[in-house]
């Protein structure tokens, strides 16, 4: 029975169909003017860029220029690249220009499609970022498509690992910049740790096109980018804790694979308490006493490392390091580390060098980084299953772009076996049969361990012609996958999400030329060799087509339908034939953890014989239902995480904007004056509450505050004895004295040096307090969930307390800045040469008396050190003091010894 919705779609088409129909009409208009552009000379075509820019300067919009700009880019692609964008690629380009996500099947030309909106939007000169998942793709696309952009007079840069700041700045200054999501995000964080705007590398975030957008904005959404600094080395303690876990029995802990949690049972808690006590690391009477919070954290990490994280699935050990493996793509992620001690627990488990824990200096999630762009769009082979998430979180509409030629791939029903062993026997039989008829086969696995187990089975069965692509062989990735379409080739690969390299039947011309002709220079000999390779690939393609095209054989379903669809989509590119099939068992993770209990019992009741499979469309639907449940759960997790991260993100924006304002300020006198007055107002309000009787005043505390925060010794005891004096009068007198001291200091330093000192103190204090604030927010986040047990909304509690922490941080910032500025002095150091004595500005931590940092040296003021009689010394002017003995009374009149007063800063 057809539902009314289904009937309506048949009559009127889906909303996707209607939208495509509208865009196709516009694509037809562009095709209609194609002849006009074909008749232009190269010079006339290149002149179009300047013409379009002049039109924009004259008030025209990008939308009005779209038909002509797309026609220009299409014609340039034909002349420079030898490729003509199809009408469906024009449609995809319009979707990208209009802040959408273009879902385009593998092999349909996403990279070429992107050149159309990239060219159009680059005309504004504000910068266009094309974001890819790895350096190889960023470099490849920048080199290939850069020829097209350069032909049209646009500049192209590429951001990749290993560039210095000058190279990065130059790349970001280009009209078009290719780069990875990681590099762009880290550059943003690093920029917001700089002290001068000239040191920053990025421009404002204008327009980004994200390739493999589902991988970056969905799969990576839970992974924050973090810049961190090392803390103390606790490797011995990690190693000690690690020795406890192998001693545990199954009844000592509980594992929840669905929630990915591991906890100690009561029996297990007693056991580790005994072990800790024997090792002398248990404080108090119980493991859960407040003194043991850090120990419990280490124990939980060690338990997770041993019981939830698997070597060669979640990580590999390489060069004495733990390297994380992306669960979605199977790629290694060197440089990435699990936070909060988990990575150290894994290092202890695998007996590699334990790196020190890190403190977060700056962090941001991809969700919040990419939402900073004025205009964001994306492209991928699979996005429809996550359309709701793209719409809710990023405001991006997903549009499925029709293929240029009909898809001929046959997607067969899944085969389900009772055990993993039976499943693998069936897989080997199927690989052998397809291999013998010369069909290229791509075998998808979910982990390194499983890919290598299957490879070993094939060797034992006498199938030797296969290649393995997983995180261990990451460097050969592009070449291996490019040759996966050669007849008879068997390629075993971990998850194919985001691979970025096309599998072409017969082989990849560009890759073979690079591999075989790298030593032959341009010329007739090279051209002849290329012609031979082309002919060979054409022959091999005919053989592959005759054998049925690429066969995608998957050994397991992934949690995400999207990953499965990406694997299927490797076959049947551009109208080629192909087939796909999934082999499953009841022992697979998805079936075991999330699968339907009814399916399990039903299959067992059928009494299947050994090596017998059940194949039915109902099985596919049941599995899809299980996957939808997982996807919905993961979406809720990401949505919830974003709500918490938005709180920090709002605060991050305030802090980063303040830093930028500080960089641009040429005179901070007014800003610092306001901060000084606010500190004084808070100080007086605390010690002399409004409308309180004089007996309630804390005059001793106020005097202490004035000395510690303002470095002044004022007669507040005498003021308090005056008849009728109120708190406003205290405020005014303290402000007057503090302003006078600050003005005298500014006069001694000179305006240029004073501004530099003020900027340095404010920005470094801000950075230090922001880092502490991030730690405080992490702690708050880790405990606020328990408020739910008290019937309080954890998110609202987090918002309220995070705001209070933020306000407290800003108040603390004012105090720290003013305290340091009221103490900073020019210190004369022994000159290397008498005629050029240097002077150094230092900032002293008022609480420790230690030199907080030493940022600048100046030699444009020159003073001789000499002994000066006390009578000639001006207490307010250290320049008149000359050399003072450290145990002598300080000439400033404070009554303290010089070494405990102004001498403390030398």
UniProtKB/Swiss-Prot annotation:
- Identify the keywords attached in UniProt to this record, alphabetized: ATP-binding, Cell inner membrane, Cell membrane, Cytoplasm, Membrane, Metal-binding, Nucleotide-binding, Protein transport, Translocase, Translocation, Transport, Zinc
The listed locations are: Cell inner membrane; Cytoplasm
Q: Name one GO biological process term.
A: protein import
Per its record, how is this protein called by name?
Protein translocase subunit SecA
| Transferase among keywords | no
What cofactor is this protein dependent on?
Zn(2+)
Classification of source organism: Bacteria, Pseudomonadati, Pseudomonadota, Alphaproteobacteria, Hyphomicrobiales
Q: Which family does it belong to?
A: Belongs to the SecA family.
Q: What are the GO MF terms of this UniProt record?
A: ATP binding; metal ion binding; protein-exporting ATPase activity
What domain of life is recorded for the organism?
Bacteria
Main EC class of this protein? translocase
User: For the region Disordered, what residue ranges are annotated?
Assistant: 829-898
Q: What EC number(s) has UniProt assigned to this enzyme? A: 7.4.2.8
